[in-house]
Amino acid sequence: MDFNLLTDSEARSPALSLSDSGTPQHDHSCKGQEHSDTEKSQQNQTDDSNPEDGILKKKQRRQRTHFTSQQLQELEATFQRNRYPDMSTREEIAVWTNLTEARVRVWFKNRRAKWRKRERNQQAELCKNSFGAQFNGLMQPYDDMYSGYSYNNWATKGLATSPLSAKSFQFFNSMNVSPLSSQPMFSPPNSIASMTMTSSMVPSAVTGVPGSSLNNLGNINNLNSPSLTSAVSASACPYASTASPYMYRDTCNSSLASLRLKAKQHANFTYPAVQTPASNLSPCQYAVDRPV
């Protein structure tokens, strides 16, 4: 009967185990654990190295290109001639300036953005300087010009008040023009008032002019009556000037004045007395004087 004897070193090692037949066999489970531990350590090392590589790549992307004065001069000269160079032109510039084509392309892109921004700012400044001062001089703020007008204050204003006459407008003052003319409006002409006459002064025997029409025309004296003046002032616009309004002098009033002047001159004019034949002559004498 054969017995498998183990040495002391084999008996102490946990990797060996006895089979049913008694032959020593190596334990593979311990070896698998050792391999898994080594693989995990290698993966951890690779994971630690990956973030470092990513950081290095990001730092490389964020690097700024420092151009020399000669390179900038060449790039600026090309940009003045052509703001959108094609691929071949960019490659030529890259050869001249000792740069890569990608850096030249990025430089032109940034330079165009800077140029567009400067153009917008210049246009805004030009519009502000050219038109802003003119509009500010002509147009005053709304609250300053119309501070006297507010909502729901029409009932407090009297009919005789004149806020426009007391209100001064800077635009009209600069032009020496008042918003409402100081010349009286709707006032009868003084020439008509001075030449008006009563119906008793107008002769009824004026040829071509009936006396009734002259009497009707004589009623123009009533224009200066107090009742008419009060009526005009009461019906006047509450925002008009306190001065009497102005009336347009048409040709009808002037012709009326000339007609009255002619009538007055005709009344003062006296015809020479006509010598009538002597009434003491008899009819016989008339017959004798007549030629046969």
UniProtKB/Swiss-Prot annotation:
An annotated Gene Ontology molecular function: RNA polymerase II cis-regulatory region sequence-specific DNA binding
GO cellular component, one term: nucleus
DNA-binding positions: 60-119
Signal peptide (residue range): none
Keyword annotations of the record: Developmental protein, DNA-binding, Homeobox, Nucleus, Transcription, Transcription regulation
Nuclear localization signal, short sequence motif: residues: 260-264
Compartments in which it is found: Nucleus
Physiological role: Transcriptional regulator which may play a role in the differentiation and maintenance of meso-diencephalic dopaminergic (mdDA) neurons. May play a role in the normal lens development and differentiation.
Protein name from the UniProt record: Pituitary homeobox 3
Native organism: Xenopus laevis
